[in-house]
Amino acid sequence: PMPSNSAGLATLIWEKAGCPEPQTVKSFSDIDDADLHLRQAASWMEEQGLMDDVKENEFRPYRYVTKLQTCLVWDKAKEESLIS
């Protein structure tokens, strides 16, 4: 199914890319430190420029994303050969 929030979108693209290690795993104020999987996905997505509305220390994992936003991020990841 199509993700409906930032957490789902980040996880989908990151997993499709093979779960690459981000250069730095950030501590976002709104992602539990125990949720390493999501912190890695969010950090990698931000590093790749795929989530450009991330605040300095806030990911907003439950922010609603539209189907169009998901498609645009998907296309950008494909264009940059991050996913196949």
Where are these regions (language model features)?
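Feature responds to low-complexity, polar/acidic, surface-exposed segments characteristic
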Residues: 1-10, 15-39, 52-64, 76-84
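Glycine-centered, phosphate/nucleic-acid-interacting loop/turn motifs that mediate DNA/RNA or nucleotide
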Residues: 49
